[in-house]
Regions:
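N-terminal Rossmann-like dinucleotide-binding module
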Residues: 1-50, 393
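Predominantly a Rossmann-like dinucleotide-binding segment in NAD(P)-dependent oxidoreductases
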Residues: 10, 127-215, 344
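Short, conserved SAM-binding/catalytic segment
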Residues: 45-53, 110-114
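Short acidic low-complexity segments
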Residues: 54-66
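Beta-strand-loop-alpha-helix segment that lines the small-molecule cofactor/substrate pocket
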Residues: 65, 70, 76-77, 81-128, ...
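Glycine-centered short loops/turns at secondary-structure junctions
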Residues: 91, 118, 143, 230, ...
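Glycine-rich phosphate/pyrophosphate-binding beta-alpha loops
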Residues: 187, 212, 236-244
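C-terminal glycine/acidic-rich active-site capping loop/insertion
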Residues: 227, 254-325, 346-349, 357-398
């Protein structure tokens, strides 16, 4: 295979941006051959925007058409696993938008199909391409900070207005989106958190429903995590603070690292703090760490970087930015946070009981208010296709 024939299932905001990137020749080794959407207005837009690209009104039609070698799945969250599984079973490579689905049970089912398929299965965790996160990952993995003691991430610059939530009936509903800020916006941060600091063994969470907006899911959340080695972590996020903050601090035995305002700052001791604690003959110790500052010399390749790596994985056998199977990790954390909230903020051990979560999520979805008459369908469709490129809010913002 010299060229990957790509189909995009779902051409709303992000799907349209992907389509323009591939159609415009920005991804080497890949050509846009088909798009699919259930909304006729989006297909009309595609007819005008993507000359020669086939259009389908259902995912099943596109998957069975024989026009594609691979697909990008960019549909509402609850359909991610179902459509991705169908594509993999049909012999197509799959790049799934985040999150992998709304629950670890559904993600696990998709992962099993992916392993059996022998096809490339990747997930759109585009913030892993950010050079600051890549550098911090390298520092922690190499042991530069020593054993991690604590991590704190305040990421409250995901501000959204009520107009945003009213732009689609599926948004911010249990039956449509399957969750709030933890599942939609902060999914990227939860992934980076576990990618760098590892998976916690337990979490206790406070997920505030409709704290800042007229919605039925959480728009603010605080997670307290404990790790197998005794380390702790705190994760705070919301879509209701303006201006917000994005500050990620990781503290270890040899110092600490902080990412904030588009730069990484590193404080390193000349020996382990544990050595200082037990060998010093003084009551107090004035630390004089070496201080380093890292400013990235490369740009975040973001979504295009993920799609390019997906193309290369198919054609060259190189790894994608994130294997699809890794998507279950951040879901494990967000699902545990929801369980903690639903069970009176009790501590939840990981891995969670997937069946229990599915039952409780279904109960929430059954009482969902997803049929809100907050925006006219025609207006929503027009909003979905009013731009052609990637929006800055989809990348790391400081």
């Amino acid at each position: 295979m010299d060229i990957v024939r790509l189909g995009i299932i779902g051409i709303g905001n992000i799907g349209t941006a992907h389509a323009h990137a591939v159609y415009g020749g920005e991804i080497s080794g890949m050509k846009l051959k088909a798009v699919c959407d259930v909304n006729p207005k989006r297909l009309e837009y595609a007819k005008a925007a993507f000359d020669g690209v086939k259009r389908f009104s259902s995912a099943d039609e596109l998957i069975k058409s024989g026009t594609c070698d691979a697909v990008i799945v960019s549909v509402p969250h609850r359909l991610h696993s179902q459509i991705s599984q169908a594509a993999l079973k049909a012999g197509l490579h799959v790049l799934c938008e985040k999150p992998e689905d709304v629950s670890v049970g559904r993600a696990d089912a998709l992962n099993r199909v992916a392993r059996e398929s022998g096809k490339v299965f990747a997930i759109m965790l585009n913030q892993r391409t950010n050079p600051l996160f890549k550098k911090l990952k390298q520092l922690v993995s190499s042991g530069k900070l020593g054993r991690i003691k604590n991590s704190v991430w305040i990421v409250t610059n995901w501000y959204r207005t009520q107009h945003y939530y009213d732009s689609g009936d599926w948004r911010a509903t249990w039956s449509g989106e399957g969750g709030g800020v933890l599942l939609n916006q902060a999914v990227h941060n939860l992934d980076i958190w576990q990618w760098i600091c590892g998976m916690p063994s337990s979490v206790t969470a406070f997920c505030d429903r409709a704290r800042y907006h007229n919605i039925e899911v959480e728009d603010a959340a605080t997670i307290f995590a404990r790790y197998p080695d005794g380390a702790t972590g705190t994760f705070i996020t919301s879509t209701g603070e303006c201006p917000g903050t994005n500050r990620f601090e990781v503290s270890g035995e040899y110092g600490k690292a902080v990412i904030e305002d588009g730069r990484l700052k590193l404080w390193l001791l000349d020996c382990s703090e544990r050595k200082i604690c037990f060998e010093s003959e003084r009551d107090f110790y004035e630390a004089k760490p070496s201080v380093y500052e890292y400013l990235p010399d490369e740009k975040e390749s973001a979504h295009k970087g993920v799609i390019q790596a997906f193309s290369d994985a198919i054609l060259k056998g190189t790894p994608p930015v994130a294997w699809g199977e890794e998507g279950i990790n951040e879901l494990m954390i967000s699902n545990a946070a929801y369980l903690s909230q639903w069970k009176n903020n009790t501590t939840v051990n990981l891995p969670i009981d997937a069946d229990e979560f599915e039952r409780m999520l279904d109960k929430m979805a059954q009482s969902s208010e997803s049929a809100r008459e907050s925006a006219k369908p025609a207006e929503k469709a027009e909003k979905q296709i009013s731009h052609v490129g990637y929006q800055s809010r989809w990348s790391v913002n400081w």
